[in-house]
Amino acid sequence: ALILGQEFSKRTINLEVSAGHSRKQIFTSKIISYLIAFNLMALVYPVSGCIREFGRFGVADVGMFFYNIIKAIIYSCLLNSAIFLIAILICCYLQDVVKATSVTAIIIFGLSLYLGYGMMLRLPVGFLPTYQIRIVVSMKTFFQPIAILVGCIWSGILVLLSWIKFCKCDFK
């Protein structure tokens, strides 16, 4: 939210439009580059934690260890991207770095609170991508259709809404 908000605030996107790039090119490049950067940053901590614990406790089955790491990486990228796209949507609507960062933080904090208390109070939490990550890493099977569906629905809706708003933004 911070970086994309700065691009709106500092009118970087306006310069890209003025340079002759289409909105589709700009939007697609922003989404792809930010999702790659976000997922790389989001995976550093879990992967380093696995390596640290591997060194400390060892692993009984190396194949299963790497199977679980690959599964966690793939599903984390899909489901964390769905959460990160909230920031993209908010930035497209607010077009201000401070407002977008604040609103995004509040929304994600609210979703985290709902996940924590929702699980305790037995509220429906299966629609949350963060909950699906928890389910996927605790299951033995690799293919988790519900997690894939949740990630794709969240991502699809958020990208569509972001694109619609991005097309309506006034760039001069």
Feature roles, as predicted:
Residues A60, T101-K172:
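Terminal transmembrane helical anchor/hairpin motif
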Residues E7, G20, Y93-L94, L160:
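Helix-loop interface residues and adjacent transmembrane-helix termini in multi-pass membrane transporters
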Residues I3-L35:
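Helix-loop-helix units of permease transmembrane domains in multi-pass membrane transporters
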Residues A1, I13, L85-I86, P129, ...:
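Hydrophobic/aromatic residues in alpha-helical transmembrane segments
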Residues A1-I3, F27-V98, R134-L149:
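Secretory targeting signals
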Residues F8, T12, R52-A60, L94, ...:
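Membrane-interfacial segments
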